[in-house]
């Protein structure tokens, strides 16, 4: 028989840097999950990512206080800034452009995010990522 689900916790944690301090500790503590067990498992699973890269994670907590978790791909905004070599996007993206990014780089990001996105095809996902780039003040070039 399947375990009964007590709840879900969605967090964004830096790869290889999960520790009991906020936001991880309080979120897991409310559900009675062993915080150190999660931190060790998360850090082991995310060691292949660049250290400090934000990784979305969905933690499923069961009534017996056990848990499973699923890691997602890094946010598109983070990948776009990394590809463009920038620290942050524009505060006024319509008037103030902060950088440029090649369409091929946008396509690579769309392929990376394909497992988490609900696009019909790779072109639709690429257009979605291009929209994110424009909203951050990046110009997409061919």
Curated annotation (Swiss-Prot):
GO MF entries: large ribosomal subunit rRNA binding; structural constituent of ribosome
SUPFAM superfamilies: Ribosomal L11/L12e N-terminal domain, Ribosomal protein L11, C-terminal domain
CC annotations in GO: cytosolic large ribosomal subunit
InterPro entries reported for this sequence: Ribosomal_uL11, Ribosomal_uL11_bac-typ, Ribosomal_uL11_C, Ribosomal_uL11_C_sf, Ribosomal_uL11_CS, Ribosomal_uL11_N, Ribosomal_uL11_N_sf
Keyword check for Signal: no
An annotated GO BP: translation
Residue ranges of the TM segments: none
Origin: domain of life: Bacteria
Record bears the keyword rRNA-binding: yes
Pfam families (alphabetical): Ribosomal_L11, Ribosomal_L11_N
Function in brief: Forms part of the ribosomal stalk which helps the ribosome interact with GTP-bound translation factors.
Subunit: Part of the ribosomal stalk of the 50S ribosomal subunit. Interacts with L10 and the large rRNA to form the base of the stalk. L10 forms an elongated spine to which L12 dimers bind in a sequential fashion forming a multimeric L10(L12)X complex.
Name assigned to this protein: Large ribosomal subunit protein uL11
Native organism: Shewanella sediminis (strain HAW-EB3)
Organism lineage: Bacteria, Pseudomonadati, Pseudomonadota, Gammaproteobacteria, Alteromonadales
């Amino acid at each position: 028989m399947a375990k009964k689900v007590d709840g879900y916790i969605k967090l964004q944690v830096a790869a290889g840097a999960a520790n009991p301090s906020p936001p991880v500790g309080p979120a897991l503590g409310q559900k009675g999950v062993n915080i150190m067990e999660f931190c060790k498992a998360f850090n082991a699973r995310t060691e292949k990512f660049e250290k400090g890269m934000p990784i979305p994670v969905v933690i499923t907590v069961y009534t017996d206080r056990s848990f499973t978790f699923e890691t997602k791909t890094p946010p598109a905004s983070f990948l776009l800034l990394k590809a463009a070599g920038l620290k942050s996007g524009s505060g006024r993206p319509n008037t103030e452009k902060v950088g440029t990014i090649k369409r091929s780089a946008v396509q690579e990001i769309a392929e990376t995010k394909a497992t988490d996105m609900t696009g019909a095809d790779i072109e639709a996902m690429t257009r979605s990522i291009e929209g994110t780039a424009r909203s951050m003040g990046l110009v997409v070039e061919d």
